[in-house]
Amino acid sequence: MKILVTNDDGPFSPGLAILREAVRGLGEATVVVPETPKSATGLGLTLHKPLRVNRLSLDGEPVYLVSGTPSDVIYIAMNVISGKPDLVVSGVNIGDNLSVQVILTSGTLGAVLQASIEGVPGIAFSAAVDTPEELEEGEYRNFVLRSTKAIVRAVVGEGFPKGVDALNVNFPSVIASDVVVVRPALKRFSTAVVRRKDPQGRPYYWLYGHPVEAEEGSDVHAVLEEGKIAITPLSLSGMLSYSPEALSGIVKKVKEELSR
């Protein structure tokens, strides 16, 4: 089995070290990551400048660095470095990736969703912690490592569920033993814009958000309120589904306007 290991936090993230260790011995693993942190880049691709690839050694193992986004990594890995993998694993992200709002902006998820578009299943791992240090050592690190290893091995052994293209896995900030399959909440944060002025009096803006109340039965509630490991299945076919009848009125009016 060929496994591509990636993330959006760059080569020196303790979450990447956990993921590299978790897949060791499962097959032929290749590690390809953005050369610098690329959080919140979603499915973004670099189309306005060339991409560079470098290589370094971490703990005696090769790690390839791409001067782009996690989505860029997928295409560079497949076409330049290692060929098409059987599985992509991404993470372990510093911070949770909960809700549709965050899933669609996350670089960690962007990598596995981009791979899914190319027909390769993927698993994204995230931990609801505030700092990298929490994944560097101690009982919590061991919990995340053991859980990640167990999930990857279970998926490899059982195979990906039918109709599922990617799995979004989130670990709570506390050691847990309960694992639940849940839907994503719609939102994780309320959004706001702060306007400020620079020394020249020109305005600039910061985007930020406050956590919203967790929807019961959602990934946000399971991880942040109940302290459980949440697995959320994601399907591209769900995004592609449509009902022609639902748009019949709109289509009719457009046709009438164009026929005048």
Swiss-Prot record:
InterPro entries: SurE, SurE-like_Pase/nucleotidase, SurE-like_sf
Swiss-Prot/TrEMBL keywords: Cytoplasm, Hydrolase, Metal-binding, Nucleotide-binding
Cofactor descriptive note: Binds 1 divalent metal cation per subunit.
Catalytic activity: a ribonucleoside 5'-phosphate + H2O = a ribonucleoside + phosphate
Source species, domain of life: Archaea
Cofactor list: a divalent metal cation
Annotated compartments: Cytoplasm
Listed GO CC annotations: cytoplasm
Listed EC numbers: 3.1.3.5
Positions contributing to a divalent metal cation binding: 8-9, 39, 93
UniProt keyword annotation of Hydrolase present: yes
Matches recorded under HAMAP family: SurE (MF_00060)
Functional note: Nucleotidase that shows phosphatase activity on nucleoside 5'-monophosphates.
Annotated family: Belongs to the SurE nucleotidase family.
Name of the protein: 5'-nucleotidase SurE
